[in-house]
Amino acid sequence: MTSLPCPLPDRGASNVVFPDLAPALSVVAAYPLGLSPGTAASPDLSYSQSYGHPRSYSHPGPATPGDSYLPRQQQLVAPSQPFHRPAEHPQELEAESEKLALSLVPSQQQSLTRKLRKPRTIYSSLQLQHLNQRFQHTQYLALPERAQLAAQLGLTQTQVKIWFQNKRSKYKKLLKQSSGEPEEDFSGRPPSLSPHSPALPFIWGLPKADTLPSSGYDNSHFGAWYQHRSPDVLALPQMM
């Protein structure tokens, strides 16, 4: 028997047997050997692949050496989950708020006192003369008298009232200093009645020690009185 050469399948028969491979084979046959449609369409890809920079990377190679750290730094700075600060204890927050309030209170008080403090009134010599004369006449002014005096001197009623109050307090202090309370004297002398009165003597005419009766005299006198009594008088308590 003689073997007949097997005829090559027709292109139409291959399409029937392998319908999916037919378009690929037709496309490959249209380009030269070793080139794909992608490589033939973009000749720059072969150049980039030769240097190890495939087009599949989303970020191209850095232009300078310092820029190579930027992508990793961006990933570290912007993590997937946001950073949450640990919650502090509510009691600590209240304590801090109280400390802050206490630290602000003295400064506020100082500012208020500075704002409320009024300038000191300066009286002229003529005004002081009239005020002193009126104070010698009377230490307390009624409301009409105060208004009249304030109008005469060109002052307010409050200024006249405050001046009289200060003058009364000074006058009382002077009286206390002039009278002076008796201080304790440890020298053995009693305090004097007034600063100008003479000192009283320490001994007030007391009898001397030699004139005082002795204890022996008292005993002898009592013994003599006991001897002169009758026995009947002495026996009365026993009979009762």
From Swiss-Prot:
CDD domains: homeodomain. InterPro entries: Distal-less_Homeobox_TF, HD, HD_metazoa, Homeobox_CS, Homeodomain-like_sf, HTH_motif. It comes from the Eukaryota. Residues 44-70, 175-194 are annotated as: Disordered. Pfam families: Homeodomain. One of its GO terms (cellular component) is nucleoplasm. One of its GO terms (molecular function) is sequence-specific DNA binding. Keywords: Developmental protein, DNA-binding, Homeobox, Nucleus. Branchial arches, molar and incisor teeth and limbs. The keyword Zinc-finger does not apply. It is found in: Nucleus. Residues 116-175 bind DNA. Gene3D superfamilies: Homeodomain-like. Belongs to the distal-less homeobox family. May play a role in determining the production of hemoglobin S. May act as a repressor. During embryonic development, plays a role in palatogenesis. This is Homeobox protein DLX-4. It comes from Mus musculus (Mouse). The lineage of its organism: Eukaryota, Metazoa, Chordata, Craniata, Vertebrata. The gene is Dlx4.
